[in-house]
Design a protein with these regions (language model features):
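Short acidic, glycine/serine/threonine-rich loops at helix termini
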Residues: 2-5, 13, 46-50, 78-79, ...
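Iron-sulfur cluster-binding electron-transfer modules in prokaryotic oxidoreductases
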Residues: 69, 177-402
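Generic beta-strand/beta-sheet core signal
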Residues: 2-6, 36-38, 75-77, 110, ...
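Ferredoxin-type iron-sulfur electron-transfer modules in oxidoreductases and energy-metabolism complexes
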Residues: 14, 59, 80-104, 114-115, ...
Length: 402
């Protein structure tokens, strides 16, 4: 079991003292048991070693310690400790995170999440984000100013978190620190930004058209001033090799097994490198070659799974777009009669989570592996391929299939 003790208050420290004394009395005096199993004696159990082993045995331990380490340099205060309240010293306050994302209160700061995090080494790891948030929560509860920590946390804790959830795959208790970050982003978002997000959600087709025009204008400017100067002028937003926008592909097959294909907005916004075909056109061609008759819902340019809004902390707008997409997919799939395929793993995971199996949604990776490969005759090519297993595909367990 996991319990989170807030050591920021004296009454909670006293409560913990009474708990430890009661547990030790129950185990040692009532059942003549051992206070430790696979774990060794640490500072938390050092005051109770004499209770467990008896005064005579504990005296022998102290004599041996004195012989080998008379200055007390080796592991001081562990096992042998004359302070009966050593387990109550230097306790770290762990205030509750509140209602933003309560599961972070279960974090024991083990650090298993750190190797999974894309931003670990750049700014903070998930463990460090949680620890920093706890300190900010403690300061707020104590009426203290957040100080430099509060300013630094905006970039190091919030802006650089990918919100991918890979930390949850390694966490012993399944904590997704990205959920906390998105909630905090939502708390901190300005009124103007929230209004713009609401407008984008309500007029997504127009927003996408505007973004397409901006990308086209960027390519025009790049042709005039060059990519390096444009990159500097845009503050690094414009990158060399920025793809051109391409429209969603059109299905042509009229016979075959029906499958609903939703071209996600990222694929609609950014086309493939010239002269390769657009992602949606490629997916449709492969589906048709495998004997499927793809159904592309009408009005896809106005549709979005909501992932882009959720990443910014706009939870209501994200759910709005997910619900709109669900309604369209339900009609297109004849109430779930036909499978539904999405071509971006982040969007697939978003809709799988939102729908909770109300509709048969498949990521293109799993559908290609499970449904397309058995129908296709493949010709292998001895050419190198760069394979990137992204965060969402990894969370859905598609490594082997990819």
């Amino acid at each position: 079991f996991v319990f989170t003790q807030d050591f920021g208050r004296a009454e909670e420290v006293d409560r913990y003292r009474r708990l430890m004394e009661a547990v030790c009395e129950l185990v040692v005096q009532r059942y003549d048991g051992s206070l430790k199993a696979e774990h060794g004696t640490g500072r938390n159990m050092a005051p109770f070693v004499e209770l467990e082993w008896g005064t005579k045995a504990y005296g022998l331990m102290k004599d041996i310690k004195q012989l080998f380490d008379p200055e007390g340099l080796l592991n001081p205060g562990v096992i042998i400790n004359d302070d009966p309240e050593a387990h109550l010293r230097n306790l770290k306050p762990m205030p509750a995170a509140g209602q933003l994302y309560a599961p972070v209160d279960r974090c024991i700061e083990c650090g298993f999440c750190e190797p999974q995090c894309p931003s670990h080494g750049l700014t903070l790891s998930p463990r460090q984000r949680i620890v920093s948030w706890r300190e900010l929560s403690r300061r707020e509860a104590a009426g203290e100013a957040p100080g430099e920590l509060g300013k630094d946390y905006l970039y190091m804790g919030l802006d650089t978190c990918a919100g991918c959830g890979l930390c949850a795959t390694a966490c012993p208790v399944g904590i997704d620190t990205g959920t906390l970050v998105r909630a905090v982003r939502g708390e901190n978002i300005s009124g103007v930004a929230r209004q713009l997000g609401r407008m984008a959600a309500n007029h997504f087709g127009a927003t996408q058209a505007l973004a397409r025009s901006a990308i086209k204008a960027g390519h025009l400017a790049e042709a005039i001033v060059g990519p390096r100067l444009l990159g500097r002028l845009s503050g690094g937003a414009w990158k060399a090799g920025m793809p051109h926008p391409q429209p969603a592909g059109r299905a042509t097959a009229v016979s075959g097994d029906k499958v609903v294909y939703f071209p996600t907005c990222s694929g609609r916004m950014f086309g493939a490198d010239t002269p390769e075909a657009a992602l949606s056109a490629t997916v449709i061609r492969v589906l048709e070659r495998a004997g499927y008759a793809p159904i592309v819902p009408d009005g896809v340019d106005a549709l979005c799974c909501g992932q882009s809004f959720a990443s910014k902390g706009l939870a209501d707008e994200a759910d709005q777009k997910s619900a709109e997409l669900e309604a369209v997919l339900r009609r297109a799939s004849d109430n779930g009669r036909y499978p539904i395929v999405l071509d971006a793993s982040a969007c697939s995971l978003r809709m799988k989570t939102f729908l909770a199996e109300r509709l048969p949604v498949f990521d293109i990776v799993e559908f290609a592996h499970d449904a397309l490969l058995p129908r296709l005759m493949l010709q292998k090519k001895a050419e190198p391929v760069l394979l990137h297993l992204n965060c969402s595909a990894s969370r859905m367990g598609f490594a082997a299939k990819l």
